[in-house]
Amino acid sequence: MIKMKIVNSILLIITLALVTSCSNNMKPEDFKNTKPSLLIEEYFDGKVKAWGILQDRGGKVTRQFKADLVGSFKDNVITLDEDFYWTDGEKQKRTWKIKKIDDNNYVGTAPDVVGEASGAQYGSAFKFKYDLMVPFKNKNIKISFDDWIFKQDEKVAINRATLTKFGFKVGELTVFFMRY
């Protein structure tokens, strides 16, 4: 009986290791020749509307939102004010400060981001990695975001984010952006 539990535990650990090692290995550089080019300092300079869904690790939609974003670019820094309106009535506000380091790299901060976010832009894609303090059951927990934005045309961009905790996927976020 004990040997069977040990074997089952080992099989579970191996399975989890295999599943987590099959993670997405896309790199921003993979998109260097794609069009239309996404420069976030241009795309988010002005007003942008957003609509999004949050899914749990099984794919079930757990929350939906609309958002108003207003950005400005000055002295190599994007200030992006985000106002979220969740369908359950919750309202959230976040202000990003994203600094352009060179032609392709960025760092960003926001009050609920732990440390600095790191970003890279190539072609039509922008990747942004950060840890966010998220409200959960009357406390805040740290969730890691692996965020990708893909520009579709001059007005439309699509955002896909994988959310992880301790390296395990806990959810996905899909956002549709429209400049106006």
List PLM regions with ranges.
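Bacterial N-terminal signal peptides that target proteins for export
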Residues: 2-10
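Glycine-rich, aromatic-bearing surface loops/beta-hairpins
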Residues: 146-147, 151-180
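N-terminal helix-cap/turn-to-beta initiation motif at the start of protein domains
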Residues: 31-47
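Central antiparallel beta-sheet cores of small beta-barrel/beta-sandwich binding domains
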Residues: 51, 55-136
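A short, Trp-centered hydrophobic/proline-enriched beta-strand micro-motif
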Residues: 44-52, 159
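C-terminal motif of bacterial Sec signal peptides marking the signal peptidase cleavage site
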Residues: 18-21
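Amphipathic hydrophobic-ligand
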Residues: 61-67, 140-145, 169-173
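Bacterial signal peptide processing site
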Residues: 23-25
